[in-house]
Amino acid sequence: MIIDELYETVNKKGNVCVGLDTALSYIPESMRESHENVEDCIFEFNRTIIDSTLDAAACYKVQIAYYEALGIEGLRAYSKTLKYIKDKKALSIADIKRGDIAKTAEMYAKAHFEGEFESDFVTLNPYMGFDTIEPYLPYVKNNNKGLFILIRTSNKGAKDLQYISTRKNTKLYNIVGKKVSSLGEKYMGNCGYSSLGGVMGCTHQEEGIKLRKKLKNIFFLIPGYGAQGGTAEDISAYLKRGNGGVVNSSRGILLAYKKEEDGFKKYGECARQECVKIRDDILKISQNKNS
């Protein structure tokens, strides 16, 4: 199962998921000026980030909206980036957050698990109902693919719906998490986690500890580190013996070069340093908790 590959990679390289949410404005100006087209510029930047962080990153999350916004050239760069990740024998997450049903969802599954946009995992939004998930499951079963399903996110508006309580005083996101966990039992890896993972925004330790205990078989994709206030201490609560989740950092890694004078000349090196720092911060906290 694909989740076993991710689990083993986390054991070897740590918990960092490098977010390739690559806006043109993130790319050094001198680099933008030296390229005639958007496709080559974006891809060269991404390739350098991947090469520089390969030994310290568990996986790469590519947010499709940043590429769609750039039209056909952007989507070509998106496709090239996913293929390059595969060529480097690394794991990719296509951050597409699809949430449709029936034939439309089947086409989304085909688009992102086959052909030009093929990835190892995709992110999905189940809040229209769990029939949004069903068309992807044959790929999980037969094609060694995985899902990260939105359970509880870290944005401010998450409380508008996800935190609504039922008559039994159970929050909606807990119900969604329980359903993901139950469905995931059919797609378990040898590592003890399912190839049906969950997107679990990092908020605070107490809640993380509760969720980790409730959702024992769910491997977490954890946004919210750094820019949204999550700390290594918070994140460690969502892990079990240092595994069971990957922590996404996008701008923090992509824009690390801006912290240094003339950093634009070594943006790949700066990205690697930030990736290693995040990895080591999380590892240190996890080791202290397990010692």
Swiss-Prot record:
Similarity remark: Belongs to the OMP decarboxylase family. Type 2 subfamily.
The keyword Lyase is annotated on this UniProt entry: yes
Active site: K97
Pfam family, one: OMPdecase
Pathway: Pyrimidine metabolism; UMP biosynthesis via de novo pathway; UMP from orotate: step 2/2
Molecular function via GO: orotidine-5'-phosphate decarboxylase activity
Gene Ontology biological process terms from the UniProt entry: 'de novo' pyrimidine nucleobase biosynthetic process; 'de novo' UMP biosynthetic process
Gene3D superfamilies (alphabetical): Aldolase class I
Keywords: Decarboxylase, Lyase, Pyrimidine biosynthesis
Record-linked InterPro entries: Aldolase_TIM, OMPdecase_type-2, OMPdeCOase_dom, RibuloseP-bd_barrel
Entry superkingdom: Bacteria
Record SUPFAM superfamilies: Ribulose-phoshate binding barrel
Catalysed reactions, as listed in the record: orotidine 5'-phosphate + H(+) = UMP + CO2
Protein EC: 4.1.1.23
Organism placement in taxonomy: Bacteria, Bacillati, Bacillota, Clostridia, Eubacteriales
Annotated protein name in UniProt: Orotidine 5'-phosphate decarboxylase
